[in-house]
Amino acid sequence: MKLIFAGTPEFAAAALRELIAAGHEIALVLTQPDRPAGRGMKLKPSPVKEVALAHGLRVEQPEKLRGNQEAQQMLRDIQADVMVVAAYGLILPQDVLDIPARGCLNIHASLLPRWRGAAPIQRAILAGDDETGITIMQMDVGLDTGDMLSIHPVAIAADETAATLHDKLAACGAQAIVETLGRLDRIVPRKQPEDGVTYAQKLSKAEAEVDWALPAEQVARAIRAYNPAPGAFTQLGGEPLKLWMASAEPGSAEPGAVVSADADGVLVGAGQGLVRVSVLQAAGGKRLAARDFVAGKSLPAGTRLGV
């Protein structure tokens, strides 16, 4: 099948690799323009661009598609069967959605209609969902409102972080799009249910600051959901302290008060229950397992976090 592929981060790169391996003709790859990154803020290509160039594929990086007649004509000239879209980062107007013979298919990281929007992976963990997955969707101009072509459930583990769930879903999405394209002629699209719609709004750095007055389970989920970005944090002696891994335990203590700090973790009071933080990062330092963190920094019982 002759494809245009549009995507930017590693989530999309996994799908591109799988489509190439499956033998599809990738006539064009669209991805976001190179962005400054790293300490030197040098321009860095997206993961999708790196994969595309490694396989000798044509890459284009328009700043926008809406109203961009030159880019739209370029897409028409390809005469693609399908455009596959995965975390591209640009809005596709109707005149672009109509260009491929069979439209545009999106790889969305949730079981729609739950978690439409920008941050479905993190929002699923924050909400305490047991399951999420991949939806392959026929795109329309709405926010993840198109007809569903296939759904692929993925379990959320008790200790899941956004990083680990991302990798599971990227692998699932890559397999799902190949499978769906392979039986596209036999699929009857299904409307999304009207019940159960939720929206996964974009994450903000402000919401990643830990509120120790919340129940321990909610705090622990937030710490895992914000790993790797934007990174949950609290205050320790006026300095930011990042928290990367945590679980909830029974018990009680003042919210934000350290109960104990040893090789098994830093145990902190919450609004209901205790939070055991097992991976931490002091300002200017590296991520450390609790064992190594407490070996270099004293956290006596009663130390207050968040102040």
From Swiss-Prot:
Catalyzed reaction equations: L-methionyl-tRNA(fMet) + (6R)-10-formyltetrahydrofolate = N-formyl-L-methionyl-tRNA(fMet) + (6S)-5,6,7,8-tetrahydrofolate + H(+)
Keyword entries, A-Z: Protein biosynthesis, Transferase
PANTHER family: METHIONYL-TRNA FORMYLTRANSFERASE, METHIONYL-TRNA FORMYLTRANSFERASE, MITOCHONDRIAL
Protein name from the UniProt record: Methionyl-tRNA formyltransferase
Superkingdom field: Bacteria
Family per record: Belongs to the Fmt family.
InterPro entries: Fmt, Formyl_trans_C, Formyl_transf_N, Formyl_transf_N_sf, Formyl_transferase-like_C_sf, GART_AS, Met-tRNA-FMT_C, Met-tRNA-FMT_N
CDD domains: FMT_core_Met-tRNA-FMT_N (cd08646), Met_tRNA_FMT_C (cd08704)
Function as written in the Swiss-Prot or TrEMBL entry: Attaches a formyl group to the free amino group of methionyl-tRNA(fMet). The formyl group appears to play a dual role in the initiator identity of N-formylmethionyl-tRNA by promoting its recognition by IF2 and preventing the misappropriation of this tRNA by the elongation apparatus.
TM ranges: none
The keyword Protein biosynthesis appears for this protein: yes
GO molecular function, one term: methionyl-tRNA formyltransferase activity
EC number: 2.1.2.9
GO cellular component, one term: cytosol
Residues that bind (6S)-5,6,7,8-tetrahydrofolate: S110, L111, L112, P113
